[in-house]
């Protein structure tokens, strides 16, 4: 009987985790934070053995927090510049004669000195944080119903 309860709980976690994922994706699209689409494609839901993990690509948390100077300095400058170079391809800007390289250099320098503008403004709470309370409540309610409705004896 406990295995049956455990499987029902895992099913609830998978269901609610996927709803959470859809809400996060919707928030990313609504806030226009989807330049390359890599972050949206990276979000995964893993529910097994009564555990739920929702995860995404490295630095997913930066969508709400921005990048601090400390975090930017943890990366090699050339690595950071290369990441900015790749990201800049999705910006609606035309670069000619090495301007993309200068842009990448300047943005990388700025990140290491001041952090991103989002970080400087204190971050935001409308990508994933605002959906967490509903996720926890829905899981709690549904798991509670499973326990109440299961006759163990």
Show which residues each predicted segment covers.
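Charge-rich, low-complexity N-terminal segments
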Residues: 1-46
């Amino acid at each position: 009987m406990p295995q049956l309860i455990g499987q029902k709980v895992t099913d609830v976690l998978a269901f609610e985790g996927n709803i959470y994922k859809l809400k996060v994706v919707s928030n990313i699209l609504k806030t226009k934070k989807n330049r390359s689409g890599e972050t949206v494609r990276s979000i995964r839901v893993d529910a097994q053995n009564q555990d739920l993990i929702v995860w995404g690509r490295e630095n997913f948390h930066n969508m709400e927090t921005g990048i601090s100077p400390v975090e930017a300095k943890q990366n090699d400058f050339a690595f950071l510049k290369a990441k900015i170079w790749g990201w800049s391809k999705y910006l609606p800007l035309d670069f000619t004669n090495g301007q993309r390289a200068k842009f990448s250099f300047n943005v990388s320098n700025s990140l290491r000195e001041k952090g991103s503008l989002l970080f400087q403004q204190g971050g935001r709470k409308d990508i994933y944080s605002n959906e967490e309370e509903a996720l926890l409540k829905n899981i709690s309610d549904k798991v509670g119903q499973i326990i109440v409705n299961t006759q163990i004896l």
